Structure formats: structure tokens, C-alpha cells
């Protein structure tokens, strides 16, 4: 009986040690730069990827990401889905915007930061080449207060108002305009120089969002305004413990 207990304990210790070793080797740190005219985003990330097929080519993973975004002269529009499309839920993907419900918050200099949990999907065609997609799931956002100009579709074209706003403080991935806050996603191709070093090139699709200090009465008491960015992206990833 003692031999059985000893064997069980040894097996558990060995399994735990292997799991710890695999976790350490899978640490993947990334630095990404995304750019489009009058806007830029810098991302710092950490992730863990795990093969889910027999050949280990298809991988799922999780991680954390910091985003720092700067822009000039951007128009943030009414964010909530119930206003932009008159719908809630996944059907917002297939419904056109209701233009008369959409107001504009124009900001000369925008600055947003976020820390989010991230979901990763990747596929390796070979040891050198692969493709991937990732998306922020939930987290927090922060940044300084900004003054902007509010222009309403329900007001005369020559009428505007100055409004103060801050980045929406929390981020939640839902679906399309149901999303809340600052959320980043990337679609990319990967080239692996070796087991430790790789580069990604592709596109960043980024939501940033301001919450006004006061609700806008003529916009159905809405206080959330969103800007959607599409930028080119280049990143470097490094696995320091990979053998």
C-alpha cells in the first residue's frame, strides 16, 4: 500500500513539475505599434498559448495587454447600440445605423490607456509561418479629461456646445456597438525567426470611448461616445524561457 501511495505522489509531483515547466516556457511578451494618419497605439502584452489539436498547429490562449492611444482631430459618435441601431444583442451586426440618433463629440487631442484580459487564436502553417487573431475581453481604461465640441443631429447645423469628458473607466467585450469602453483586436501574419523571437504584421481594429461629465439631454440622455480606428500594425514577440 505504501508503494502505491508513493507512486501516486511521485506521479502528481512529476505532472505538476511538467505543467510548471510548460507554463514558464510559454511566456510570450510582445511590443506592438499601430499607426494610421493622426493616430497611433502602443501595446505591451503577455500571453500563454496552448495547442488544442494533435499536431499542435491550432492554438488557443489568454493574456494581458496594455494599450496606449493618441490621436488628433477625431470625431467620437454616439456609442450605445440601442441608439445607433435601435437594437441590442448580436443582430446589431446586421442593422444599419439610425443617422438621426447619432451625435458627434469632436476632440482635438485624444489620449486613452487600457489594461485588458485578451483572448488569442493562432494557427501555424509551418515552423516559420502562421496567422493569428486576438481581442480584448474585459478590463479598465484611464486617461485625462478632454474638452470637445458636441454637435447634435437634432440641433441646427450651426449650433454646437463645449463638453468635458473622460475615457469610459471599464471595458467589456459584447458584440459590435454593444461593446463598452476601450477594446483592441488584431489580425496578423506571423514569422518566426526561431523558437524565441517572432514578428507579426497585420491590422489593429480599436474602439476608444469617452464618457461625458454630464448626460446629453438631446441625445436621449446618452453620455458615451465612441471612435473606431483601423490601423496597420507591426509587433515583436519574445519567449525568453523557450527551449
Annotate each PLM feature.
Residues 41-45, 72-81, 143-152, 156-159, ...:
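Outer-membrane beta-barrel translocator domains and adjoining extracellular loop/strand segments
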Residues 25-27, 38-44, 58, 111-115, ...:
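Residues that define the transmembrane beta-barrel architecture of outer-membrane proteins
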Residues 48-52, 119-125, 177, 191, ...:
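Residue-level signature of outer-membrane beta-barrel architecture
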Residues 20-84, 239-243:
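Short glycine/proline- and aromatic-enriched beta-strand/turn motifs that initiate or cap beta-hairpins
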Residues 61-121:
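Outer-membrane beta-barrel translocator/channel fold
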Residues 29-33, 60-64, 117-119, 131-135, ...:
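Membrane-embedded beta-strand positions of outer-membrane beta-barrel proteins
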Residues 30-34, 47, 102-107, 170-175, ...:
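Extracellular loop and loop/strand-boundary signature of outer-membrane beta-barrel proteins
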Residues 183-243:
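Predominantly the C-terminal beta-signal and adjacent terminal strand-loop region
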Amino acid at each position: 500500500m505504501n508503494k502505491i501511495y508513493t507512486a501516486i505522489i511521485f506521479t502528481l509531483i512529476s505532472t505538476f513539475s511538467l505543467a510548471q515547466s510548460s507554463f514558464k516556457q510559454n511566456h510570450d511578451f510582445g511590443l506592438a505599434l499601430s499607426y494610421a494618419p493622426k493616430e497611433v497605439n502602443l501595446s505591451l502584452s503577455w500571453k500563454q498559448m496552448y495547442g488544442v489539436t494533435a499536431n499542435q498547429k491550432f492554438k488557443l490562449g489568454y493574456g494581458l495587454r496594455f494599450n496606449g492611444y493618441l490621436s488628433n482631430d477625431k470625431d467620437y459618435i454616439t456609442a450605445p447600440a440601442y441608439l445607433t441601431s435601435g437594437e441590442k444583442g448580436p443582430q446589431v451586426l446586421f442593422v444599419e445605423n439610425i443617422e438621426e440618433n447619432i451625435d458627434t463629440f469632436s476632440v482635438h487631442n485624444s489620449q486613452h490607456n487600457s489594461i485588458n484580459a485578451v483572448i488569442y487564436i493562432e494557427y501555424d502553417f509551418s515552423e516559420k509561418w502562421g496567422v493569428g487573431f486576438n481581442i480584448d475581453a474585459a478590463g479598465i481604461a484611464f486617461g485625462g479629461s478632454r474638452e470637445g465640441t458636441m454637435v447634435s443631429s437634432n440641433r441646427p447645423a450651426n449650433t454646437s456646445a463645449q463638453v468635458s469628458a473622460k475615457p469610459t473607466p471599464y471595458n467589456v467585450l459584447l458584440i459590435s456597438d454593444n461593446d463598452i469602453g476601450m477594446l483592441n483586436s488584431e489580425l496578423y501574419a506571423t514569422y518566426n525567426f526561431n523558437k524565441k523571437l517572432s514578428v507579426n504584421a497585420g491590422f489593429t481594429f480599436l474602439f476608444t470611448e469617452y464618457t461625458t461629465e454630464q448626460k446629453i439631454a438631446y441625445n436621449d440622455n446618452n453620455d458615451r461616445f465612441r471612435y473606431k480606428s483601423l490601423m496597420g500594425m507591426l509587433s515583436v514577440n519574445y519567449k525568453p524561457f523557450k527551449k
